[in-house]
């Protein structure tokens, strides 16, 4: 079983972090740690979206060759 979180799990965790930080009830040290964790999750989400976009841009023709579509 893989320990890698799904896109949806990462998004939920990022939303939770943002909510905690928005309350303002977090100690400064904890807020910095949460912010850093959120930034890492955000980068992972962006990477996943980029990979998905690259996959969707390719379309297989009937003969099996790939065609790049305009984005």
UniProtKB/Swiss-Prot annotation:
Question: Which keywords, in A-to-Z order, does the entry hold?
Answer: Cytoplasm, Exonuclease, Hydrolase, Nuclease
The answer to whether UniProt assigns keyword ATP-binding to this entry is: no
Localisation per UniProt entry: Cytoplasm
Q: Which Pfam families match?
A: Exonuc_VII_S
Its top-level enzyme class, in one word, is: hydrolase
Cytoplasm as a keyword of this entry, yes or no, is: yes
The EC number(s) given in the record are 3.1.11.6
Q: What does UniProt give as GO cellular component? A: cytosol; exodeoxyribonuclease VII complex
SUPFAM superfamilies for the chain: XseB-like
Superkingdom per UniProt: Bacteria
An example molecular function term from Gene Ontology annotations: exodeoxyribonuclease VII activity
Reaction equation(s) it catalyzes: Exonucleolytic cleavage in either 5'- to 3'- or 3'- to 5'-direction to yield nucleoside 5'-phosphates
Main subcellular localisation: cytoplasm
- One GO process term, biological-process aspect: DNA catabolic process
Briefly state the protein's biological role. Answer: Bidirectionally degrades single-stranded DNA into large acid-insoluble oligonucleotides, which are then degraded further into small acid-soluble oligonucleotides.
Q: Give the record's family classification.
A: Belongs to the XseB family.
Q: How does it assemble?
A: Heterooligomer composed of large and small subunits.
* Name the UniProt record assigns to this protein: Exodeoxyribonuclease 7 small subunit
Encoding gene, per UniProt annotation: xseB
């Amino acid at each position: 079983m893989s320990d890698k979180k799904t896109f949806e799990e990462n998004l939920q965790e990022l939303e939770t972090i943002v909510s905690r930080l928005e309350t303002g009830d977090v100690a400064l040290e904890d807020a910095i740690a949460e912010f850093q964790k959120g930034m890492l999750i955000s980068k992972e989400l962006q990477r996943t979206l980029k990979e998905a976009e690259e996959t969707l841009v390719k379309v297989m023709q009937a003969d099996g060759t790939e065609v790049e579509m305009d984005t």
